[in-house]
């Protein structure tokens, strides 16, 4: 690993860490700020659903736009940084606008922050795929995911620490961190474009259509959303009191982060699609076992395995999206992938808003839904890859 690759990778890890923590701060304080703005509590989940719907649309559009902006080296980074400054400003103003008791102003700022923050979802990954060489790409992508995993592990602790804090300081710190980090996007783009070897042109035929890939991503993302957000806490509560959940929920993300280093090697050796398929298959087994683990120790082992499997799925999916989009459509493919992540999150919140997760007749089905989704994704991917191999052979 060269020093430039290491520095750019650490930069992307920090960018993802700060961005994900900003979203965590938003989730923690949204109910209180919305109440101050005069918005009924019953609207909270629907605001979050609307946020994810905005991501579904904006992520794909922003990714496609990034493809066009990146045709001239050095043009994309500064523009993304400028958009992020507007995003950080809207985010910063949320706790100051809430006491004005204007629901419209609060919702407008929320919308502005959500739609502009799409600049930090697909486009940075597109930069990695467009400019990073074959050797550097897994390292940088792995560090990018490591930042995401660290934020996921910290989130439960932040929820407890910040629950009763003044919202203005966390919002200010998060806004400044995101804005300052994003401002260096031009530096990252320039170094990626000049310090790494040119990316080889792909073969004329892709391993599978982008549409099929997005179906696979949607299945794995829905499995993750239901498992981590709806199933994990009830599984732990079979063995521990609710007060211990803050220490146990990060176990999934510990497995996620521990998998990063070996996955960097596995991606290089076996390729993105095989790692994605293996991650989905292992994840299906892990989450299925978690539903019937007979002790806390076995449940922790299952959660660690599920976290490592989700890391393999995301790592493989990121590389697969870049490969399917090359050359010239990396942003379109990665934007579509992030749209599917947002779509799955929207479905999960919709389940909660409509109380489907409380329906006793559906709870058993929901418990097995993550395993079914991940197994279906693995099976579909293997079938498509075999069909491609047979056609080529």
Regions found by a protein language model. Give the residues of each.
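Helix-loop boundary and gating motifs at the non-cytosolic
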Residues: 1-55, 212, 216, 221-238
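Glycine-rich segments within core transmembrane alpha-helices of 12-TM secondary carriers
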Residues: 138-157, 338-349
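Structural signature of the two symmetry-related core transmembrane helices
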Residues: 76-93, 274-289
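A late C-terminal transmembrane helix in Major Facilitator Superfamily
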Residues: 327-359
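A membrane-interface helix-boundary motif in multi-pass transporters
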Residues: 160-177, 353-375
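Intracellular juxtamembrane helix-capping segments at the cytosolic ends
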Residues: 119-132, 312-326
């Amino acid at each position: 690993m060269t020093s430039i690759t290491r520095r750019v990778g650490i930069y992307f890890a920090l960018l993802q860490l700060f961005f994900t923590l900003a979203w965590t701060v938003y989730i923690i304080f949204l109910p209180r700020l919305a109440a101050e703005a005069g918005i009924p509590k019953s609207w909270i989940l629907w605001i979050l659903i609307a946020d994810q719907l905005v991501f579904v649309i904006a992520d794909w559009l922003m990714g496609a736009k990034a493809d066009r902006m990146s045709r001239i080296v050095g043009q994309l980074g500064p523009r993304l940084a400028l958009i992020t400054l507007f995003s950080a400003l809207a985010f910063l103003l949320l706790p100051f606008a809430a006491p004005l008791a204007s629901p419209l102003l609060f919702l407008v700022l929320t919308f502005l922050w959500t739609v502009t923050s799409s600049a930090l979802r697909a486009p940075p990954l597109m930069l990695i795929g467009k400019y990073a060489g074959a050797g550097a790409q897994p390292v940088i992508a792995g560090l990018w995911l490591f930042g995401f995993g660290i934020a996921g592990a910290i989130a439960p602790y932040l929820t407890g620490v910040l629950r009763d804090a003044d919202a203005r300081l966390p919002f200010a710190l998060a806004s400044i961190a995101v804005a300052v980090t994003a401002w260096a996007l031009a530096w990252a783009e320039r170094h990626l474009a000049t310090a790494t070897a040119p990316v080889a042109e792909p073969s004329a035929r892709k391993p599978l259509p982008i549409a099929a890939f997005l179906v696979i991503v949607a299945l794995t993302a829905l499995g993750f959303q239901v498992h981590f957000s709806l199933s994990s806490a009830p599984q732990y509560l079979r063995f521990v009191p609710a007060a211990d959940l803050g220490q146990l929920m990060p176990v999934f993300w510990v497995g996620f982060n521990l998998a990063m280093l070996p996955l960097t090697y596995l991606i290089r050796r076996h390729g993105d699609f095989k790692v994605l398929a293996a991650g989905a298959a292992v994840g299906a087994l892990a989450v299925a076992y978690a539903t019937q683990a007979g002790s806390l120790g076995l449940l922790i082992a299952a959660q660690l395995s599920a976290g490592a499997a989700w890391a393999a799925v995301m790592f493989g999916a990121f590389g697969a999206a870049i490969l399917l989009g090359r050359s010239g459509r990396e942003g379109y493919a990665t934007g579509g992938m992030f749209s599917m992540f947002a779509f799955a999150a929207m479905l999960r919140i919709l389940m909660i808003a409509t109380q489907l997760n409380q329906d006793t007749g559906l709870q058993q089905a929901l418990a097995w839904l993550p395993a079914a989704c991940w197994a279906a994704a693995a099976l579909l991917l293997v079938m498509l890859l075999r069909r491609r191999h047979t056609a080529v052979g």
